[in-house]
Curated annotation (Swiss-Prot):
GN (gene name): Znf22
PANTHER family in UniProt: ZINC FINGER AND SCAN DOMAIN-CONTAINING, ZINC FINGER PROTEIN 22
Ranges for region Disordered: 1-33, 188-218
Molecular functions per Gene Ontology: DNA binding; DNA-binding transcription factor activity; RNA polymerase II cis-regulatory region sequence-specific DNA binding; zinc ion binding
Lineage: Eukaryota, Metazoa, Chordata, Craniata, Vertebrata
Protein name: Zinc finger protein 22
Keyword field contains Mitochondrion: no
Organ and tissue specificity: Highly expressed in the ameloblast layer of mandibular incisors, moderately expressed in submandibular gland, calvaria, kidney and lung, and expressed at low levels in brain and thymus.
Listed GO biological process terms: odontogenesis; regulation of DNA-templated transcription; regulation of transcription by RNA polymerase II
Family according to the record: Belongs to the krueppel C2H2-type zinc-finger protein family.
Length: 237
């Protein structure tokens, strides 16, 4: 039994070959402008496995394993934030960032800890939390070998070795190694300002009594000075 030719006179293998070549040509054209399409999902997976990053940004030379990641990255250079929050108007470069931000308004916490049931808005927060249960401390100091569960804790610790104090007070120019220490220090200035405002408010609302009180203090001070002077005069006699 002889098999007939498919309609159009073109075999299936030839048609697939033309489609594949067409996609390769499109990919080469897109790569010329710093963006390439993913025409082979299997190839993309293999690239991720071997850490190959063929998609390079023409602005900053940063490379990526997928064209979609490069496309999102290029928005940083253009400054275009096309994903806007309907609640507060804040805009983002990526839709994933907007989704995370929206959870502030909705209160949604989709990431749940299997150990204790605590929920989180972001997967990264859940990963950090789970280290409390596992005891994992993957971030170690090169200077003293001390390890931490979070990278931010390691950065703070390393400042004890370097002496770096990046957080500066705008009021008195005093510097601190941690932002929490700066916030604690700022309370001192806040208390001083509120105390000063309270004095000014009393002077405005009760000017006579405030002046009287101030006058009494001045008179009391003069009496003390006079008393001390008279005592010295008596001793000399």
């Amino acid at each position: 039994m002889r098999l007939g030719k498919p309609k159009g006179g073109i075999s299936r293998s030839a048609s697939q070959g033309k489609t594949y070549e067409s996609k390769r040509k499109t990919a080469r054209q897109r790569q010329k402008w710093g963006v390439a399409i993913r025409f082979d999902s299997g190839l993309s997976r293999r690239r991720r496995n071997v850490d190959e990053k063929p998609y390079k940004c023409t602005k900053c030379s940063k490379s990526f394993s997928q064209s979609s990641t490069l496309f999102q990255h290029k928005k940083i250079h253009t400054g275009k934030k096309s994903h806007k929050c309907a609640d507060c108007g804040k805009s983002f470069f990526q839709s994933s960032n907007l989704i995370q931000h929206r959870r502030i308004h909705t209160g949604e916490k989709p990431y749940k800890c299997d150990e204790c049931g605590e929920r989180f808005k972001q997967s990264s927060n859940l990963i950090q939390h789970q280290r409390i249960h596992t005891g994992e401390k993957p971030y170690c100091c090169d200077e003293c070998g001390r390890c931490f569960s979070q990278s931010s804790h390691l950065i703070q610790h390393q400042r004890t070795h370097t002496g770096e104090k990046p957080y500066q007070c705008e009021e008195c120019d005093k510097c601190f190694s941690q932002s929490s220490h700066l916030r604690q220090h700022m309370k001192v200035h806040k208390e001083k300002k509120s105390h000063k405002r309270g004095k000014n408010a009393r002077a405005k609302t009760h000017p006579v009594s405030w002046k009287r009180g101030k006058g009494r203090k001045a008179v009391a001070g003069l009496r003390q000075v006079k008393g001390a002077a008279s005592g010295l005069f008596k001793k000399k006699k």
